[in-house]
Every structure is written in structure tokens, then in C-alpha cells.
Amino acid sequence: MPPVKAPGNVSDCYFVGRVSLLKWISELLNEPVKKVEDLASGHHYCMALNLVYPGQVNMHRVRMNAINEWERSENFKIIQDVLSRNNIDKGIDVNKLVTGKYMDNFEFFQWFKWFFDQNYKGSKSGATESGSANAVTKTSKPGNRSGSTAASMQNPKASSTSGPSIDSKELEDLRRQIAKGQLESQFYFDKLHEIEIYMDQMNELMTQVEIAEPEDSPFYIKSVVKKIEDILYAEYHQ
């Protein structure tokens, strides 16, 4: 089996939004996940990975809702081991993910969703067992759905021809708009990522160099860095 390559930064997987990802993982695992930072625990990925490769994840070793970085590291090492054994070419920067920073975890979250969709062969509408972890379910409401299904089976032509038609020109225009939006989204994502890298470099530099500006000054370099970090890592509120 040839290795499954991780997509580059221009891949469509990096255009999936935070809200969609959190909704997906919450429904998949039947466990509410409210923040991207919660994924730093690693146990969510272990549970989902055990659906892709049933029985290959030793769920007895997984530390659920891990808080300490060393516990989280153990979970991500389990994930890395399973991926490597299945010839998946994806390096995991464990040291970054376990700190719980939004940008690092969001990027890995996007990749994992892409990977799951590419490799999961089970039913996404029924209950699925996840090793020794909790049962992972994704249910749909009965009633109206079954009724509409029965109606479509009785009258297949009606279901196949219903809805407005879109000509090729309109479809092409929509594709161009989507492509433009994706490029703009990636552009701003890259900017944020560069700022995060710069902040890490500045924090490291400030531990080695004495700053002459008084600490109570709004232009004090540590104050500037702290303010930018506050903006970068502020939680989203609907």
C-alpha cells in the first residue's frame, strides 16, 4: 500500500471552518466538543482513529480528557504510532499540539477531518463501536426522513428531476467565486500563522535580551507581544 500523503497548505482540507469541524467531531463521537483547544487532549483523535482502524488503537492506554502535557503527549504518540503502522505519511508536532494553542490544533484538526473522510469505510449514519471507548453514534431523526425516503422510492423520477437547474455558465461562475474565497481564506490564515511564529520567536528572544523600555509603558515589547497573542488566541463567541 503506497503511503497516504498529507495535503499541502493549499489543499481544500484547510478551508473547512471551525464550526463545521466541531459539529462533525461532536456528532461522530457523541461527545460535545466546544473548543478547538479541547482537541489538545488527543483522546478524541484516538477514538476517531479506532473507527478508521478498528482494534489498532489500544483504548486502555488512552488518557481521556488529558490535562497535563505529558498525558496528552502519550495520546498523540499512540496516534502517531497507528498512522506510521498504516503507512500514513504525516508527522505530528506533539510538542506544539499539547500546549493547546488554537492555530496549531486547528490546522491538525483540519488535516485529521480530511484523513478520516479519505479512509473511514464504515456507516456514518448508524451506531459504531469504538473499541473499549464509548459507543460512537450519529443518529438521524425518524419520521419525516423515512416518509420522504418511501416517497422517493415510489416515485424515483420526481426526486431526480426536482429542484432548480443551473446552467454550465452559472456553475462555472460559482466555482470561480468559491475558488477565490478559498484563496483569500488561505491568505489570511497564512498571515495569522506567520504572526504566531513571529510571536514565538520574540518570546524566545525576550528571555535572552534585556529590554530598556519600562514595563509600565504601552510600547514595552512584552506588552505588545502579549496584546497580539490575546487577539490571536481569543475564543470565538457566536
Swiss-Prot record:
Changing S152A: No effect on phosphorylation. Induction: Expression remains constant throughout the cell cycle (at protein level). Expression remains constant in trophozoites and in encysting cells (at protein level). Interaction between the C-terminal EB1-specific domains of two protein monomers is sufficient for homodimerization. Changing S162A: No effect on phosphorylation. Keywords: Cell cycle, Cell division, Cell projection, Cilium, Cytoplasm, Cytoskeleton, Disulfide bond, Flagellum, Membrane, Microtubule, Mitosis, Nucleus, Phosphoprotein. It is found in: Nucleus membrane; Cytoplasm, Cytoskeleton; Cytoplasm, Cytoskeleton, Spindle; Nucleus envelope. GO terms for molecular function: identical protein binding; microtubule plus-end binding; protein homodimerization activity. GO terms for cellular component: 9+2 motile cilium; axoneme; ciliary pocket collar; ciliary tip; cytoplasm; cytoplasmic microtubule; cytoskeleton; distal portion of axoneme. The gene is EB1. Changing S148A: Loss of phosphorylation. Decreased growth. Decreased number of cells in interphase. Increased number of cells arrested at cytokinesis. GO terms for biological process: cell division; intraciliary transport; microtubule nucleation; mitotic cell cycle; mitotic cytokinesis; mitotic nuclear division; protein localization to microtubule; regulation of microtubule cytoskeleton organization. Residues 101-238 are annotated as: Interaction with aurora kinase. This is End-binding protein 1. It comes from the Eukaryota. Residues 124-165 have a biased composition (Polar residues).
